[in-house]
Amino acid sequence: MTDRQTIALVLGTRPEIIKLAPVLRELESRDHPYTLVHTGQHYSGNLNSVFFDQLNLKSPDYDLGVGSSSHGEQTGTMIREVEVALNEIDPAWVLVQGDTNSVLAGAIVTSKMDAKLGHIEAGLRSYDRTMPEEINRILTDHASDHLFAPTESAAANLATEGITDRVTVTGNTVVDAVDQHSDLAASESTVFDRFDLSPEKYLVLTAHRAENVDAKERFQSIVKGVSRAADSVGFPVIYPIHPRAEERLSEFDLSIPENIRLVEPLDYLDFLHLQQHAATMVTDSGGVQEESCILETPCVTVRASTERPETVTVGANELVGVDPAEIVAAVKAAVETDADWKNPFGDGTAAEQILDIVCGNHVVDNTHVNR
């Protein structure tokens, strides 16, 4: 049995690694005991282990290797394996970040044991129940002993669901991550040379969500719209393609126009540098919406809803769906946008604020305030 001050962190995907990196560094700086549990939800090397190495983070203490499968099978396997790991660790707190199946598994297991559950990036809502992540967010928020909301808007979402007494608005750890890594990315990234790019003279596409890439017509529409947009502004497109999307391109026999360049998934520093200097991002990723806003890079989101409405409110992001004409119009407008919006995601001290609460309340009682 380990020290009852131990904090366990359960994660499983690239965005979780990036957003929890500031928390891990803050734990190291405080010399506070912690254990890292990686479910293996992301199973490609470039989407997983390379991030720990490049960001100088310690390797996970537990690597569960769950991999990809249906939502139910994957989550069920995670619950079983995470329970074994957490029973061995016997932590005082378990921290999860975001809205993945790894987060839900960590939340369910922790809710059944003598440990506190903290949800980082709590309160996000798209109000679209067709998104698997929306269910994960809601269930995890309602199971948590403390909720670390990134914005006042997220806290207001929780209040409408009756959660008010255990919420702290900390800002988003993605701001901490961008602040900590931007200079390093500038000094180490070679993407401009590798791809023969000039700053602010290219577009970046990221499309990986099931509702977009698993539907041939939607995927084809996105590709067509982005290609036409690139022609209209005279810029090439870099598309770091997710394994899921690459499989669908082959399965659907979709051709990629010459002005869209497919590249392998990039490491975090390369992608951050590419994102920081893009003329516009076109994405279906929630994390890219946030990072683009922080980096002052205009964003066009090929979705009908977003759990990051702050990006739209401040003028950093436009939701357009997948209609090619709307994508073209939005990209043309975005390229001309003055990035003079205010970052709505905090001041870069989220990790410190989170651990001030968690490390200051490490003694566990036998009750959970909300269960």
Q: What residue ranges belong to the model's regions?
A:
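Conserved proline-anchored active-site loop of SAM-dependent methyltransferases
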Residues: 239
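Nucleotide-activated sugar donor-binding and catalytic core shared by glycosyltransferases
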Residues: 1-235, 245-371
